[in-house]
From Swiss-Prot:
Protein name: Genome polyprotein
Pfam annotation, one family: Flavi_glycoprot
UniProt superkingdom: Viruses
Carbohydrate attachment residues: 67, 153
Domains as described in the record: The transmembrane domains of the small envelope protein M and envelope protein E contain an endoplasmic reticulum retention signal.
Alphabetized UniProt keyword annotations: Clathrin-mediated endocytosis of virus by host, Cleavage on pair of basic residues, Disulfide bond, Fusion of virus membrane with host endosomal membrane, Fusion of virus membrane with host membrane, Glycoprotein, Host endoplasmic reticulum, Host membrane, Host-virus interaction, Inhibition of host innate immune response by virus, Membrane, Suppressor of RNA silencing, Transmembrane, Transmembrane helix, Viral attachment to host cell, Viral envelope protein, Viral immunoevasion, Viral nucleoprotein, Viral penetration into host cytoplasm, Virion, Virus endocytosis by host, Virus entry into host cell, Zinc
Amino acid sequence: MRCIGISNRDFVEGVSGGSWVDIVLEHGSCVTTMAKNKPTLDFELIKTEAKQPATLRKYCIEAKLTNTTTESRCPTQGEPSLNEEQDKRFVCKHSMVDRGWGNGCGLFGKGGIVTCAMFTCQKNMEGKIVQPENLEYTIVVTPHSGEEHAVGNDTGKHGKEIKITPQSSITEAELTGYGTVTMDCSPRTGLDFNEMVLLQMENKAWLVHRQWFLDLPLPWLPGADTQGSKLDQKETLVTFKNPHAKKQDVVVLGSQEGAMHTALTGATEIQMSSGNLLFTGHLKCRLRMDKLQLKGMSYSMCTGKFKVVEEIAETQHGTIVIRVQYEGDGSPCKIPLEIMDLDNRHVLGRLITVNPIVTEKDSPVNVEAEPPLGDSYIIIGVEPGQLKLNWFKKGSSIGQMFETTMIRAKRMAILGDTAWDFRSLGGVFTSIGKALHQVFGAIYGAAFSGVSWTMKILIGVIITWIGMNSRSTSLSVSLVLVGIVTLYLGVMVQA
């Protein structure tokens, strides 16, 4: 029950008889999947890391100068030179200075002077290139087991952590007691890494434009250079003062770290953890659930008494969490739990925790359910010790219907072409059915709530027949489409 503690939660229902479900995982959100005769699973994308990004260029932002040497020549004696000029570690500058009798020359005129100083970089920053194949996604999969301490953001024994990379996009997660779920994921970072560079300075990193990074007026060396002795543009951090006869002072500018922080104002800051860079983005995953099975299907129903351990908790997702404790004998057994109308005639709402079970007597079990809007009864156990709890859920069915439809339409837009199976004609039609169910399932469920299966089919046939006999082309097409969608959802989908 990992998703209960996360505000941004999406419910995805599988089509009856379907073997796969498409989901979209984003940071800060959680997805709960439900399918007929399959366990309810929670999926959360907890981390996206860039592993071992390649270094494009290193910039020096703080340096020191040592071993300053100056050589000068009188007029007509040629150009002065120093051996240090051949050493890449030194920064040198040639100048001309006035010479004469007062400073050791027999002729008056311009004489040459050269000054060199050893340039040592003390602090640098790096620009790294991140490729999609360097990204690693960490997902936690948690079945709705109902066990104690399995509620909220628990990452202990109840969840299975799996890693997704572009090289191994298909991964299987073994869920103890529930079988195996297969995930086929397609990473989508939303960033164009060809135009962006990660600028890393100490324990902070920013995402900057590639050309801006390459144009920085600072000493630099290629990313492949591990020695640090072949810095280019060393003169950008060095100032040679005006020469005087045989002397020339040279100074180094102070640390450029503050100036870089100012220049990076407004740039996207990237979080870091254990030396790895953390990114946002989303994963489009196709779940294959044919190897999953419900736990405790062979158990009999619990016949003893239940008690509610804590007050029923309402979540921010329109669901409730009931914490019950079995006081009877015969465990392990299934928990009889239903949500009924006030007349006890119709079963309403749904169980998010499918097939809740008790494994041990007097051991609390968490059950998540979604009650209908308005008044209803939550019935736990069987007679004579049956619990009957009244519950009222606030809200508007129409508003909830349109909100759910918008969320599902957004999900389908993100999934794009990965939601479709074009390998066969049957795959195309199956994909169409899943798309209709994902987007219009909420509207269909609200419009035909409580209507029998045969009546749904009859309504679909009538709407289609009216459309085929309409004289208005636009009305005819609209009614036929609505009728076909109604027929399909009525026949193929247990919405």
